[in-house]
Amino acid sequence: MAKKSKIAKEKKRQKLVEQYAELRKELKEKGDYRALSKLPRDSAPARLHNRCEVTGRPRGYMRKFKMSRIAFRELAYKGQIPGVKKSSW
């Protein structure tokens, strides 16, 4: 389990990115890079890092399921992820 402060910081960044998305887009179209640089640093989408919804783990993230490989494996074995089953051939 990741530190709660790291998870909270990532959520805060996500909110800032959503809040400034329109303004950022307009400034980029105008080419006003000075105003862009005055926006909060955490409002840049490049600073976001995908984290597992279950554990908050930043590595081994599976985009399709929004969770880490470890949490995915545990939930898949329990049958708690719809449409996922153990393969056999």
Swiss-Prot record:
Family listed: Belongs to the universal ribosomal protein uS14 family.
Function: Binds 16S rRNA, required for the assembly of 30S particles and may also be responsible for determining the conformation of the 16S rRNA at the A site.
Domain of life the protein comes from: Bacteria
Alphabetical list of Pfam families matching this protein: Ribosomal_S14
Keyword Manganese: no
HAMAP family linked to this entry: Ribosomal_uS14_1
Gene name of this polypeptide: rpsN
An annotated Gene Ontology molecular function: rRNA binding
Gene Ontology CC terms, in alphabetical order: cytoplasm; small ribosomal subunit
Alphabetical GO biological process terms: translation
InterPro entries to which the protein is assigned, alphabetical: Ribosomal_uS14, Ribosomal_uS14_bac/plastid, Ribosomal_uS14_CS, Ribosomal_uS14_sf
Keywords, sorted A to Z: Ribonucleoprotein, Ribosomal protein, RNA-binding, rRNA-binding
Entry protein name: Small ribosomal subunit protein uS14A
Subunit structure, as described in the record: Part of the 30S ribosomal subunit. Contacts proteins S3 and S10.
Cell inner membrane in keyword set: no
